[in-house]
A protein has these predicted regions:
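Charged, low-complexity intrinsically disordered terminal segments
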Residues: 1-374
């Protein structure tokens, strides 16, 4: 199967119009699995497209993890499209998490409304919604007519479609895979854990129907398998000892290692900085580290042979607790791979290089607390 059937969508400004276009053309079925779905402009635009599809007879299934309500209510507009009420425990967790965000520009307490659009979706006979189940499912994907699959790291929220309330431009990726064979392979992976394609495969953390957590090992395989180049762009990058050592070992065997993280992450900023300080110190500045002015929500690990991106951060929680989903594709001369390499190069061109640990400041206590939490 040719990689021409794959399209890279860089950030929400490319992804959302394409996803909505495909929903507008859906004829039989639509499945959406989402971590965060806010009651904001893009959240309502997506909901309108879903409702229109259901009105013309498309069968719709939406799963929005209950886990996400804590994050939906602790930043940005603080309005959730599907989670209209919080338990006392969820409210307390949201208030606690607010402490760990570097900027406090989001509004105060906001009451969610049962909007007309929300009520029409919840009452529609062609739409089934699962929003109250706590699955700890961080993956994001859409399946349309069992023929088109979108997956990646983009939640349904305005900040992914431009910038957040602190002015940080968001960077992220989705992939569009067209062809019934891709959807069949994806469903087979979800059901049995088997990989059935030769040119691409799906990396999965999954608790049901059988617990399969493979993303930690797959990331380490990419790092340990690098012989020439290793690139990591990571939104939330914890200083896990075995990952730091694997990256340093790659540097010691002559691999060109580059790491790109947000200059001001919306969360886990101090933990991110602690990680790059360890990498810079351990390599005597030999590892090339860049701080992006964007809020890179990306989760990308790439060597000279393989590119992987999706929903999986390098954190304890991602590897041990959360359902995650990544796409693995060849790093070859395909248009998909070329688009990814150009996107990475474009991000690096506007980023600030860091060559020594002393150039990076962070709060050790906050970094420790962030590491404890995630």
């Amino acid at each position: 199967m040719a990689l021409e059937n794959l399209t890279l969508l860089v950030n929400g400004r490319q992804a959302f119009p394409e996803i909505i276009r495909c929903i507008d053309e859906a004829q039989t079925s639509l499945e959406i699995n989402m971590f965060i779905w806010r009651d904001d402009r893009i959240g309502n635009r997506m909901a309108q497209a879903v409702l229109a599809a259901a009105d013309r007879g498309v069968t719709v299934y939406i799963s929005v993890d209950r886990y996400g309500v804590v994050l939906e209510k602790c930043e940005e507009c603080k309005r959730s499209f599907f989670h209209k009420e919080q338990t006392l425990t969820e409210k307390m967790k949201s208030r606690l998490l607010e402490v760990f965000y570097p900027e406090n520009t989001q509004p105060g307490a906001v009451k969610d409304e049962h909007t007309d659009l929300y009520q029409r979706i919840m009452a529609h006979p062609n739409i089934r919604v699962s929003a109250d189940v706590f699955k700890a499912d961080h993956s994001k994907f859409y399946i349309i007519d069992d023929r088109i699959l979108f997956l990646g790291g983009v939640n349904i929220e305005d900040k992914e479609n431009g910038q957040d309330l602190s002015g940080r431009v968001y960077g992220d990726y989705m992939a569009r895979l067209e062809g019934e064979e891709y959807v069949r392979a994806f469903r087979e992976k979800l059901a049995t854990g088997r990989d059935t394609l030769e040119d691409v495969f799906f990396g999965l953390n999954q608790k049901e129907p059988v617990r399969r957590f493979e993303m930690e090992e797959l990331y380490l395989d990419l790092i340990n398998g690098a012989q020439q180049e290793l690139h990591i762009t990571m939104a939330y990058f914890s200083p896990l000892e075995h990952f730091v050592e694997a990256i340093l070992a790659a540097h010691r065997r002559g691999v060109k290692v580059t790491v790109l993280i947000p200059q001001r992450a919306n969360f886990q900023n101090d933990s991110n900085r602690r990680t790059i300080c360890q990498l810079l110190k351990g390599s005597n500045g030999g590892i090339r580290v860049w701080l992006s002015p964007k809020m890179l929500h990306t989760k990308l690990v790439m060597n000279e042979k393989t590119i992987s991106f999706g929903s999986t951060n390098i954190t304890k929680k991602a590897f041990n607790q959360l359902d995650e989903l990544n796409l693995f594709v060849p790093n070859d001369d395909s248009e998909f791979a070329k688009a990814m390499l150009e996107s990475i190069a474009s991000d690096i061109r506007i980023s600030q290089p860091v060559t020594a640990p002393g150039e990076v400041e962070y709060n050790r206590l906050i970094a420790w607390l962030e590491g404890f939490m995630v």
